[in-house]
Amino acid sequence: MKKTFLLSLLLLLGVVACKNSSTGQITPQKDVITNQIYFAEKPIVSAHRAGKGIAGYPENCLQTIQYLSKKGIHSFEIDIFESTDGDLMLMHDDKLGRTATGQGVVSQMSTEALLKERLKDDFGKETNFQIPLLKDVLAWCKQHGAYLMLDFKKGISYSKVAELVRAEQMQTQVVLISYNVEQAKALYRVAPEMLISVTIRNQSELDRILETGIEREKLVAFTGVHLADDSLYKKLNELRIPSILGTLGNLDKRAEARGDHLYKEWAQKGIQIFSTDRPFAPKF
């Protein structure tokens, strides 16, 4: 009886916490994978490069994902490269130095050599954290209900990434990022069951994407790092295609200077996801 009461209390507290959250929470899907999970009660915050500007927590780092998850952030954009051993790993830069100790082009290094280095935070401080393997990040996110937007470094095999996502049973928790129509079509061919982020900054780009034959329910629209015309957000909402606004850079700086209330104003245009370097700033 006592155990039942405690379990009920914990579930109730969880529901209240979600309702009181300042950002949107993604509702998991089990069987059918559609973009409707991103139409939450409130806009969803997605941490660019898995979290930037946080002392002691580097970008593209599993421990940063774990830290932000505890703070209520559950969507993360990460960058994928491949070592000479064929292991998929996380890093944005082509070379070591800025975000990790050591020197060298990461795609020309072995996994063993890369794992010897340590990640640095955005302030140049060395941490004890290793460059993460994608499989470890996928496994943790699967277990803890975190969602990933996967950005491919040049030359990465789409099918290899898709196979690893499937192996870790993360198909329902990823978005594959494309930057042009041909890339979107290629991703759809190798992973038709997964969601795909497509660049849609205007009506013309929307029309070209709709002509590809990619299922509409698999699309997530990246509308750029500047505000698009209000009519585009209206149209995307009519089509039930969730939109991402990349506030990273210019718009984040504007909000920092003029006030974080701007995120809420932008959300009212019909934006479902904010990709930001300031994950704690947006409040909805």
Predicted features by range, described:
Residues 1-28:
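Bacterial Sec-dependent N-terminal signal peptides
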Residues 18-284:
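Phosphate-group recognition and catalysis centered on beta-loop-alpha active-site segments
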